[in-house]
Amino acid sequence: RRDALDMARTTANRALTATVLRAGLQIQAWREEQAAPETIRRLAQLNRDLLDALCGLLAQSDEFSMAASLRRLEEAAPLGGVAPALNPHTELTLKGNAENEYCRSHHYELAAYVYRKETAAFWDDILARVEAGDRAEWPFPSELAAQAKAIEDEFYATPLAQMAPQATRGPAELADALRGLAALVGALREQVEPSRLK
């Protein structure tokens, strides 16, 4: 089970990266009037769907949940007759260690409550520019930095218990999650065929 989840997480992560890279190529081709806006829209939706699939995979195990880690710390047994005392800043520390920019990873709470919102803001900005026919080079929009800060603040203000995965877990659910990811990777492969460049 753990091996399957690890391979699937890696596959999802690589596919997410591939959709963004492919979209970058398609945006440049669109600027040069060599690609249709629909191609960019499809890649944006595929990227969002892949992130949802990653969330579904992460929800299948407590190993990827900060809420579960905190719960295990709270339930720790005494050691040598000494009851453990949980630092009141433990939850904030868990969040900070996971959310900082240089070591973000596959934590369910981050994927579901930070990455999804950041991804939505990213694609909303790009698709708005495409819909407006803005073919100029795009500077990094200051609005995205403000949105990222608001998303971060909301994440820190929301208790981990409220963000914990609620998915039903079992062999059938894991198989469904893996099949869903496989279908999305198949859709991505169709997008990267040389004939699909335009």
Where are the model-predicted features located?
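Catalytic domains of carbohydrate-active enzymes that cleave complex glycans
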Residues: 1-198
